[in-house]
Curated annotation (Swiss-Prot):
Family: Belongs to the TBP family.
Keywords assigned: DNA-binding, Repeat, Transcription, Transcription regulation
Sequence repeats: 8-84, 99-177
Primary role: General factor that plays a role in the activation of archaeal genes transcribed by RNA polymerase. Binds specifically to the TATA box promoter element which lies close to the position of transcription initiation.
GO BP terms: DNA-templated transcription initiation
Entry GO MF terms: DNA binding; DNA-binding transcription factor activity; general transcription initiation factor activity
UniProt keyword DNA repair present: no
InterPro entries for this protein: TBP (IPR000814), TBP_archaea (IPR033711), TBP_CS (IPR030491), TBP_dom_sf (IPR012295)
Protein's name in the database: TATA-box-binding protein 1
HAMAP family assigned: TATA_bind_prot_arch
Pfam families found in the cross-reference section: TBP
Length: 183
């Protein structure tokens, strides 16, 4: 299966850049940083190249969201560490970056009968309540992802830890629908 069958929409990753941060110092030094501990315990900071957003916590942990690929996550976290160092905040060398979640989209290029899919996939693996939500929610054990299936043939894959997890999730759906004669 070609890598182009999915489009990564969002990568969420976390790391620990320091033992602790003084978020008021970072807020005062980083243009556009937002910190209001009465509303949220972390500082929010957005960057534009590559586009991503950070949640920075006093514990030294950083969550990066909004990146479109794993390489961009590494780039923006590296840039964040350099920026922190430039204002006198020492960061850890080579921090371990953990991808928490990847959201991807795909298109099967066909109209789908979600009622038939719900019956075919078995009610123990799916949630389908069209009055509540127009998509069918399909939980896959291997890879451990959730695939939202829409009657338009569009899919949203969430919960992947790698782009390959998302690719495999789409392939599982494609094979199962094909086996049921629903593609």
């Amino acid at each position: 299966m070609s890598e182009s069958s999915i489009k990564i929409e969002n990568v969420v990753a976390s790391t620990k850049l320091a033992e602790e941060f003084d978020l008021t110092v970072i807020e005062s030094e980083f243009e556009g940083a937002e910190y209001n501990k009465q509303k949220f315990p972390g500082l929010v900071y957005r960057v534009s190249d590559p586009k991503a957003a950070f949640l920075v916590f006093t514990s030294g942990k950083v969550v990066c969201t909004g990146a479109k690929n794993v390489a961009d996550v590494h780039t923006v976290i590296g840039n964040m560490a350099k920026k922190l160092n430039s204002i006198g905040i020492k960061t850890m060398e080579n921090p371990q970056i953990t991808v928490q979640n990847i959201v991807a989209s795909a298109d099967l290029h066909t109209i789908l009968n979600l009622n038939a899919i719900a019956i075919g996939l078995g009610l123990e693996n799916i949630e389908y309540e069209p009055e509540q939500f127009p998509g069918l929610v399909y939980r896959i054990d291997e890879p451990k992802v959730v695939v939202l299936i829409f009657s338009s043939g569009k899919l949203v894959v969430t919960g992947g830890k790698s782009p390959e997890d998302c690719e495999r999730g789409v392939e599982v759906v494609r094979q199962q629908l094909d086996n049921m004669g629903l593609l």
